[in-house]
Curated annotation (Swiss-Prot):
This is Alpha-amylase isozyme C. Important for breakdown of endosperm starch during germination. Residues 189-207 have a biased composition (Polar residues). Monomer. It is an enzyme of class 3 (hydrolase). Belongs to the glycosyl hydrolase 13 family. Substrate binds at residues 87-88, 182-187, 214, 283, 289-291, 302, 344.
Length: 348
């Protein structure tokens, strides 16, 4: 089997795929944001264990979601702890017995944790969580597309058209962001979807916020339509052009160096490809590590899958000791970027 070699400035790093080595014990990825499972079901744990153990691979089992966003299971506030599995809304009570049950069967549990997502905590008139606290801007409902008036024959039912967002319809966009999510999932290039993301984004520009929740934009308006309506601090996007797009001092956050933008712009905290974070001195501007093979990867950006440690999490939040402990746990267990997903190991 051929193993890929990563070259960088004369150095070589051996990247071993995850499937190349069998772990000493079966692995189970314990998710917190996938499709919810009703109730506390230890019977499912027993069944999953029988499936996971012979294959020596990864499986996914999801606990019940917290009540903040009942249909998606998103966390209500950031969580960063090396010693306990903490979820807002009582998930700890459900998670600990499950982990103990797997440990009793010799199954090593890995939890997929996201700490930089933010969800709305207030319902609108339809009972959907899509209103934001006033302290981050005016709490507003995402606008709907105006109804189209059509000439119709007597007896025909009136057809309505709304913006294709989960917050507007409450049930659409299941393939992109899930049903009833608390952020917009706009698809298309009409007038209303163009105006919706910048308006919503400006009200959530304070970190940590979800700065890149809109996948599958149309390229023709993704760059100019969004970037021209937001500041550099809050720009967002997923489409990349060739070459580096950031240039800053070694201790500063990334800044755009192209005008007009050649691709979808990015937020300093999210949606940045690590290999593009090299400054003029060859180091990452404001981030920890710029070489993916050497970067610490316990934080997962769900939108892009970029492995990174956020600069403000390491210093500004005073979590250096906790992060270093998590890093040491990952190193001892052999968790590295070749796993394909960034996970936290829950210690026994």
């Amino acid at each position: 089997m051929q193993v890929p070699i990563e070259h960088n400035g004369g150095e070589q790093t051996l990247l071993v795929p995850f499937r190349a080595h069998r772990p000493p014990r079966p692995l189970l990825q314990l998710g917190s944001r996938a499709s919810p499972v009703s109730g506390f079901q230890l019977g499912v744990v027993e069944g999953e264990w029988r499936v996971v153990q012979p294959a020596y691979g990864q499986a996914r089992w999801t606990t019940s979601p917290p009540p903040a966003s009942p249909t998606s299971g998103s966390l209500r506030r950031p969580t960063l702890s090396a010693s306990k599995a903490t979820c807002w809304g009582g998930c700890t009570i459900w998670t600990r017995p499950i982990i103990e049950a797997f440990h009793g069967k010799g199954v090593q549990v890995i939890a997929d944790i996201v700490i930089n997502h933010r969800t709305a905590e207030h319902k609108d008139s339809r009972g959907i969580y899509c209103r934001l606290p006033p302290r981050l801007g005016p709490a507003h409902d995402l606008p709907r597309r105006p109804l189209r008036r059509r000439h119709r024959k007597p007896g025909h039912r009136r057809r309505t058209s709304t913006t294709s967002t989960s917050a507007s319809s409450g049930s659409s966009s299941a393939g992109s962001t899930g049903s009833r999510w608390t952020s917009a999932s706009t698809r298309g290039a009409s007038t209303s979807p163009r105006a919706t993301p910048p308006t919503w984004q400006r009200s959530t520009s304070m970190p940590p916020s979800r700065a890149s929740p809109w996948p599958r934009y149309g390229r023709r308006w993704r760059t100019a339509g969004t970037a021209s309506r937001t500041t550099t601090r809050t720009r967002t996007g997923r489409s990349w052009s060739t070459g580096s797009i950031v240039s800053a001092a070694p201790t500063a956050m990334p800044r755009r160096s192209t005008s007009p933008p050649r691709a979808s712009s990015t937020s300093p905290w999210r949606a940045i490809e690590l290999w593009r974070l090299r400054g003029e001195d060859g180091k990452a501007p404001g981030m920890i590590g710029w070489w993916p093979a050497k970067a610490t990867t316990f934080v997962d950006n769900h939108d892009t899958g970029n492995p990174c440690i956020f600069y403000d999490h390491f210093f500004d939040w005073g979590l250096k000791d906790e992060i270093e402990r998590l890093v040491s746990i990952r190193n001892r267990q052999g968790i590295h970027p070749a796993w394909g997903r960034c996970c936290w190991l829950l210690p026994s």
